[in-house]
Regions:
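Sec-dependent N-terminal signal peptides
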Residues: 4-13
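Intrinsically disordered, low-complexity segments enriched in polar/charged small residues
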Residues: 7-8, 41-42, 86
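Residues in and immediately flanking transmembrane alpha helices
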Residues: 15-16, 85
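Immediate post-signal-peptide N-terminus of mature secreted/exported proteins
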Residues: 18-60, 112-119
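Compact alpha-helical subdomains of small soluble proteins
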Residues: 62-119
Length: 119
């Protein structure tokens, strides 16, 4: 996921303002990813290792973490459209949701019946 979002950047801008903004965007995405990894790992560490799936409340808690991640990624992309590669300037929230849902982590969690209704 991180590689895809970082790939959204325009690498060819020469202006200092544009370069600074692009760098800020990269830092923002890196921070969002770090926060998500920390929150999701904390949640997963709190689970009983013997359980076969998430309870309804656990599913709701985890999906809230994922929804926050999607919201923050989309907000970062939306606020920095001018610094994204032309092919990614029209990325929508559904595109971000599809990328997150197709991530390796989310695919692994499907076997535990984790299915988040992301919006």
């Amino acid at each position: 996921m991180k590689k895809i979002l970082l790939g959204l950047l325009i690498l060819g801008y020469g202006g200092n303002v544009l370069a600074a903004s692009a760098a800020e965007y990269v830092q923002s995405v890196e921070q969002i990813n770090a926060d998500y990894q920390k929150e999701s790992r904390q949640f997963l560490k709190g689970l009983n290792p013997q359980q076969q799936g998430f309870s309804a409340s656990q599913n709701q808690q985890f999906c809230a973490i994922v929804q926050c991640y999607v919201d923050r990624l989309y907000k970062a992309a939306d606020q920095n459209r001018a610094y994204l590669d032309r092919q990614y300037q029209n990325v929508g929230k559904q595109d971000v949701i599809l990328q997150v849902k197709s991530s390796k982590e989310m695919q692994l969690l499907k076997r535990y019946n984790v299915d988040c209704n992301l919006q």
